[in-house]
Amino acid sequence: MFIIFYLFLNTSNTDVVIQWHESVSLSWTDFRGSVESNTDAVAVTASGITFSFSVKELNDEYVSFEVKANAHFYPDKSWYNKEKGNDHILAHEQLHFDITELHVRKLRYEVSKLEISQNIKIELRHLHDAINFDLAQMQHAYDSQTENSINYEQQLLWSEHIKKELKKYRTFRSQ
């Protein structure tokens, strides 16, 4: 069994998305993309962080800024093999989405520590890039250590770890 995770950094405004919410879990009906035939993958989850910011200027100086960041799941880019998909694999896919939300929370936390400066745009872009890098690294480590969901023990450990981390950053959760 093999599962692929895709991280989407740039997507079109016309893409159908599901925003992460703690009371809503993914279901197989959310995976609407076409199954790839040249792979051993059972499922593909496409998720990513949408990020934008605005900076208010007064007398040629930045005086305030606002940031928006969300964890999104892309149904039309996500798919699963109907003959092989099961609850265990769906839970593995959900955790990919949860890891994306965790990194949104980390991004919001780091943004909360920033102070307005004339370099704020650069700081925000660098922070976003760093969080996306960390997100990709964690997603890769997750699939590697769980052997794409095959290793049940590691899957459980990862599930507990992400649950703990989400709780740690709960102040910065998506609404």
Listing of model-derived features with the role each one plays in the protein:
Residues 72-108:
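Mid-length scaffold segments of soluble, non-membrane domains
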Residues 65-69:
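Envelope-exposed proteins and targeting segments
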Residues 1-18:
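Bacterial Sec-dependent N-terminal signal peptides
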Residues 15-63, 73, 116-175:
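Metalloprotease/metallohydrolase-associated module, dominated by Zn2+-dependent proteases
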